[in-house]
Amino acid sequence: MLNRRTFLKNAAVTAAAAPFISTEEILNPVPRHIGLQLWSIREDMKKDPKATIEAVAKMGYREVEPFGFNEGKLFGLGYDEFSKLLKDNGLTMPSTHSMMTSKNYDAGKNDIDDDTKKVIDNGAKYGIKYLIVPYMADEDRQKMDTMVKLYSAAGKYAKKAGVRLAYHNHEFEYATKAPDGRRIIEWLLQETDPAELAMQMDIYWVAFANHNPLDWFRLYPGRWELCHAKDVAKTEKRESVEVGDGSVDFKGIFKKSAQAGIKHYVVELENYVTTPLEGVKRARTNLLKMF
């Protein structure tokens, strides 16, 4: 039974969010963090970030995941202005993508460079919980010793700042092997400290590489604190489509969310049957049916 304090606290939270929450969600709340990777609607964001963010909020999203956080601005807006835009629409950005390469590692000091420290510090300032490396550059894939040291050093610095470093996969981490014969994903999971590097599993790319996400949940439980949710089309090209419109068993995958450690479910869309905004709206609606 709820005590009075808890009831009043919950009521206050609901009231504050009321302009952005549908009646259905109030009656049937989904206690999960469901967000949108803004790469999915990047052209709309470039044209009119204000109107686009308003549209995203009206769809029912509560979290967004920007990209290019290391570039100093987000969609032409300073961090203060972008943060206010989100707040005005009942949105938060608990995670963001921010590129990091071997050039950001100082081997002599076994540390990250000042630019990377500044990015992490900005993340902490603006409430980022997860700073996510979105990609490993081609030239860095044969330097796994260096990349592990980079992520470890960045993870240590981020932890002190109150931010969690994470890595986002594509297909190649599951297909490409490092010089010692291990897959790149195995290097990252086996050679880094879980306290210093979390993982954001892109379910589409894992399935595209003909791997089963459940196998990786079982082998490395608790490492997958975020996921990108997009489906594999039932076509010869196997392009990405909205969650629920392809061949991936998301219901089966999400039943093991606790084992995986998933805290944030992030919708992403890279191919469009209709428009980007219509696509991410459909993807969210479909995603809610997978729990």
Where does each model-flagged region fall?
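Acidic-and-aromatic substrate-binding clefts and catalytic sites of carbohydrate-active enzymes
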Residues: 41-47, 67-78, 101-113, 136-145, ...
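Active-site acidic/histidine proton-transfer and metal-coordination neighborhood
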Residues: 11-13, 20, 89, 103-198, ...
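Hydrophobic faces of well-ordered beta-strands that scaffold small-molecule active sites
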Residues: 32-37, 64-66, 93-98, 131-133, ...
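Conserved acetyl-CoA-binding loop of GNAT-fold acetyltransferases
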Residues: 61
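Short linear sequence motifs
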Residues: 32, 54, 72-75, 144, ...
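Acidic (Asp/Glu)-rich catalytic clusters
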Residues: 53-58, 75-94, 115-127, 152-160, ...
